[in-house]
């Protein structure tokens, strides 16, 4: 059903003025790293606690930033951010809020949905996470044979896998070495078998995470894990479910269930009980630090003016690159082995949220929306796609992420060298084959460290950036109708093949 709406965002005055600016930029010499070099009164470096955001290598100037902020105000972005955090039903297609921010609101202030305060459930679930993680870490959670847990296996896919996986790897300095941590996400038999050969079922805890508890891949692997135990009584000590449908978990024999709610999207469940494995690994106190980092960014995005608002600036400059400079991909390079899994995490978060061609009014959009997100470990790019970045015919935009704690190491100097080459280019008369045009727009995110607090802040930064872009594009980032349609088609094909 098509809803009535105001005029298209492309008809707004700020949009048309940005188009004129973009035309001027495209006519500008490609040898320039940006339209107007930074002056003393043009600040392109912003900071929130543990993260510095530097956009000095973007092709923007003061005029463009001002117009982008005008665009944000024209689409009522301040109101939309307030609606997100205050629990308004902004997930229009499913008629529900998107309240992942409530999961890390440590003030525990009342948030009402249909007259009910959800924070009591959030706080209660946090307490369950604390109790379970403490029991396991204190060796008081025993398997069926009376031995304490030594291995924790996370069974889930998508948001139920990528978020916990990012944490366990990124926070390796905080992770208890008294336990082994494993992940099973794929229906490929090797995914399950590669883990099972490493564990002893007597001392293993399986966490089965599925919001719907109908996810085919997750339930298939859970049933395989059940088969490791002889009777239902044994399952009690070895399985915990995280789901919005506890009755479905109970039906298959899992008694211990932690809730997630329909107002939390799977890909936004980073701060929920879906991340129980992380609380076990780093301890509940450090898990709260993860929540605190994310919550501080929530506060920052809601109350900081747009000229100093890092998620908003990242989003608006992304809009500029995508919709006005027509660069439809985002390369994310992390210069830390600890952040190896951050790129696939953001890839899902961004492309599943904003990979839409139908707006909130049910109409096809007439402009580009979410970019293709790709990337990986930055230094390894030197030996894979760095050649394309230097001299290829495809234009790219980049987010370069470094740790300040690595400033004395070669890894960060490698990053700075690559940013310089890709933005400023290389011109040499002696070797025409070595010409590099440069002018690649890029952000530089400098993390103070790779602590739980900083990781929480980084994840929230990208969550809010993606939400802000969805507002500009007038799309719903909290549903996934394409995926649901594909699932339905798969069920029909499977049913037909069984007839």
From Swiss-Prot:
SUPFAM superfamilies referenced in this protein's UniProt entry, alphabetically: SIS domain (SSF53697)
UniProt catalytic activity: alpha-D-glucose 6-phosphate = beta-D-fructose 6-phosphate
Localization terms from the record: Cytoplasm
Pathway membership: Carbohydrate biosynthesis; gluconeogenesis; Carbohydrate degradation; glycolysis; D-glyceraldehyde 3-phosphate and glycerone phosphate from D-glucose: step 2/4
Pfam families the UniProt entry points to: PGI
EC numbers on record: 5.3.1.9
Disulfide bonds, paired cysteine numbers: none
GO MF entry, a single one: monosaccharide binding
Active site location: 352, 383, 487
Source species, domain of life: Bacteria
GO biological process entries: gluconeogenesis; glucose 6-phosphate metabolic process; glycolytic process
InterPro entries in alphabetical order: G6P_Isomerase, Phosphoglucose_isomerase_CS, SIS_dom_sf, SIS_PGI_1, SIS_PGI_2
Record's GO cellular component terms: cytosol
Keywords of this entry: Cytoplasm, Gluconeogenesis, Glycolysis, Isomerase
Family: Belongs to the GPI family.
Free-text function comment from the UniProt entry: Catalyzes the reversible isomerization of glucose-6-phosphate to fructose-6-phosphate.
Name this polypeptide is given: Glucose-6-phosphate isomerase
Species of provenance: Legionella pneumophila (strain Lens)
Gene assigned in the entry: pgi
């Amino acid at each position: 059903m098509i809803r009535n709406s105001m005029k298209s965002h492309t008809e707004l005055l700020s949009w048309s003025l940005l188009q004129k600016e973009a035309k001027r930029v495209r006519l500008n010499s490609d040898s320039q790293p940006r339209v107007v070099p930074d002056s003393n009164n043009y600040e392109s470096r912003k900071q929130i606690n543990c993260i510095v955001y530097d956009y000095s290598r973007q092709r923007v100037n003061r005029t463009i930033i001002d117009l982008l902020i005008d665009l944000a105000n024209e689409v009522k972005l301040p109101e939309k951010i307030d609606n997100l955090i205050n629990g308004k039903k902004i997930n229009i297609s499913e008629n529900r809020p998107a309240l992942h921010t409530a999961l890390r609101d440590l003030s525990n202030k009342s948030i009402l949905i249909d007259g009910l305060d959800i924070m009591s459930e959030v706080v209660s679930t946090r307490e369950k996470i604390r109790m379970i993680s403490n029991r396991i870490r204190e060796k008081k959670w025993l398997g069926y044979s009376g031995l304490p847990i030594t291995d924790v296996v996370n069974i889930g896919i998508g948001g139920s896998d990528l978020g916990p996986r990012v944490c366990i790897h990124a926070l390796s300095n905080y992770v208890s070495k008294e336990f082994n941590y494993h992940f099973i996400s794929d229906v490929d038999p090797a995914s399950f078998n590669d883990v099972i050969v490493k564990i002893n079922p007597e001392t293993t805890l399986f966490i089965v995470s599925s919001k719907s508890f109908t996810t085919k891949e997750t339930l298939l692997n859970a049933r395989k894990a059940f088969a490791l135990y002889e009777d239902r009584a044994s399952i009690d000590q070895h399985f915990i479910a995280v789901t919005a449908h506890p009755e479905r978990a109970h039906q298959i024999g899992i008694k211990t269930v932690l809730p997630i709610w329909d107002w939390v999207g799977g890909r936004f469940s980073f701060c929920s009980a879906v991340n129980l494995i992380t609380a076990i690994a780093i301890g509940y106190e450090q898990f709260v630090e993860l929540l605190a980092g994310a919550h501080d960014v929530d506060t920052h995005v809601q109350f900081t003016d747009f000229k100093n608002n890092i998620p908003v600036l990242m989003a608006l400059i992304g809009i500029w690159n995508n919709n006005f400079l027509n660069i439809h991909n985002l390369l994310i390079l992390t210069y830390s082995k600890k952040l190896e899994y951050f790129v696939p995490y953001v890839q899902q978060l961004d492309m599943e949220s904003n990979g839409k061609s139908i707006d909130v009014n049910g109409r096809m959009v007439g402009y580009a929306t979410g970019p293709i997100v790709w990337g990986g470990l930055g230094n390894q790019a030197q030996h894979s796609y760095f050649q394309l970045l230097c001299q290829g015919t495809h234009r790219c935009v980049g987010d370069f992420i470094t740790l300040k704690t690595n400033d004395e190491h070669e890894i960060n100097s490698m990053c700075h060298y690559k940013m310089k080459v890709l933005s400023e280019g290389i011109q040499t008369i002696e070797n025409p084959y070595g010409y590099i045009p440069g002018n690649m727009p890029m952000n530089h995110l400098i993390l103070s460290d790779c602590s739980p607090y900083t990781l929480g802040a980084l994840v929230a930064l990208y969550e809010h950036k993606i939400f802000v872009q969805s507002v500009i594009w007038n799309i719903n980032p909290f549903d996934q109708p394409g995926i649901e349609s594909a699932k339905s088609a798969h069920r029909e094909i499977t049913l037909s093949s069984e007839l």
